[in-house]
Regions:
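Alpha-helical transmembrane segments
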Residues: 17, 21, 85-92, 126, ...
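Short, highly charged, low-complexity non-transmembrane loops/tails of multi-pass membrane proteins
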Residues: 144-152
Length: 152
């Protein structure tokens, strides 16, 4: 399970970020009839659920790392990913929620650079997840022939 988890979990996590952050979020505001308050409300719901799913993936990934031997570089990348995720959920999201509360209450016009922090965090996650996937797939490809040779 641990070797496959090192490939499957980052792939799912990467797909989640690409699908929601890079595709759904920008497109949502181009749909007919979507107002800023409606888009912000949808965004809070979608990103809240996405962050919970990301946290579950991160916990399972961490568990798989603790359960099996993995090289130090992969472990460092995975821990970095978890650190970025925690920062995104614990620091950036609450600030964005305060900001969207103000916009939804009509107190603020919007236009904050806080979304750029969230985008930057997702950018770091994308780079880290691709790196983790490359390392895991390379290791899997190198180990598989050796295992197959042992079976002969």
């Amino acid at each position: 399970m641990a070797a496959s988890a090192r490939i499957i979990l980052p792939a799912i996590w990467l797909g989640l970020i690409i699908g929601i952050s890079l595709i759904e979020a920008p497109l949502k505001f181009t749909a007919p009839g979507i107002t800023i308050p409606l888009g912000l409300g949808i965004g809070r719901l979608v990103f809240g659920v996405m962050n919970w799913v990301e946290l579950v993936i991160a916990v399972i990934l961490l568990w798989s790392l603790l359960k099996s031997g993995v090289d130090r570089v992969y472990r460092s990348v995975a821990c970095g990913l978890i650190g970025v995720l925690i920062t995104k959920v614990v620091v950036i999201r609450p600030l964005l929620n305060q900001r969207t509360d103000a916009v939804l209450a009509g107190v603020d016009e919007g236009g904050s650079s806080l979304h750029l922090l969230y985008i930057a965090a997702d950018g770091l996650l994308i780079v880290g997840l691709v790196a983790a996937l490359v390392m895991a797939v390379r290791r899997w490809v190198l180990i598989r022939p050796a295992v197959a040779a042992d079976d002969r």
